[in-house]
Amino acid sequence: ADQFEPTPGNLLNSAVGSVTGGASACLGDEGDIAVDENDMVYYLDTTLEDNWWHKFSDGGTVYESPSTCQRMNTMAADDRPWVAAQGDGIIHYLGNSGASPPECTGDVGRYWYYHSEDGGLTFSQCYAVPGGWSTIASQRHGSYVYIAQEDADTNSGEVVVRISDDYGRGTGLT
């Protein structure tokens, strides 16, 4: 096909949620998308209240999420969430609200990292990632995860790449 075809989603459920007082019911204004090695598509959508997961199987043609979508329950006003996926349902979520969430471990930072190995059903406790503007990527068929970020600790203007060679397990990023 010459054009992108629509896929089933949660638009109807979102409209119902809005009418019944269900807040945003998942539809935000920006987000990020990733595909694991089994062609499961993960979309992370953001709103002022929280982030929402949408999951599609069969190469993106079948909507798998609950009747509306799955709430992240991280931190409000997460601006520019980033997501990467690899293997069989391993998801990496890099959030940004300008401040470290209180539940994060390790150093303080503008960004925080969450890890899931069950397709986004559960996530690890977050780990603060020190530094400036960041984004995340992973190998679909390999074990490496990368976070590229500006060095906000100095005025050098350098970019730092943090690397995990173990699917981002534990803090994993050095």
Residues of each region from the PLM?
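C-terminal PAP-associated
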Residues: 1-174
